Amino acid sequence: YLLHWRGSIPLEETVDAMEELVKKGKIRSWGVSNLDTSDMKELFSVPNGDNCQVDQVLYHLGSRGIEYDLMPWLEEHQIPIMAYCPLAQAGSLQRSLLKNKEVQKIAKARGITPMQVLLAFVFRKDQVIAIPRSGRTEHVLQNWAVKDVVLTDEEYAALDRAFPAPEHKTYLDIV
């Protein structure tokens, strides 16, 4: 079960409610969505806050703000990241990512689609789980095939140059 937004209820009350649901067998575990580093630190300061199992955040090649401090903090605390919109949703941003010469070059060299390059990028860290949306069986199978794609250091470096991670704290992107 996920707390999707911070809201007006204190985190301590939310954690108590989640833990009660676990205790009653209504849910197996719980996590959060769209909580940034300061929110996660506050969450971990309340009793049982460290029982959080995941932080679901927007993350893709064109939205790398979490890499500055949230991703390292979550990694340090062994909390997986569930990347939503790992393919940058439909629209102009996704089109620009797919048409990027480095993305195209990697896709061509590997015999995969540019979309698969975008998805493979988010798996750079073992702690990242991705939940790409797909409405066609063909795309589901292409997404599944990415489990066998491991980009090289050189490929990651090329993508880093094309779409650099921020060098300072940025607001958490949300959809």
Q: Where does each model-flagged region fall?
A:
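Beta/alpha (TIM)-barrel catalytic core signal, keyed to glycine-rich beta->alpha loops juxtaposed to Asp/Glu
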Residues: L3-V175
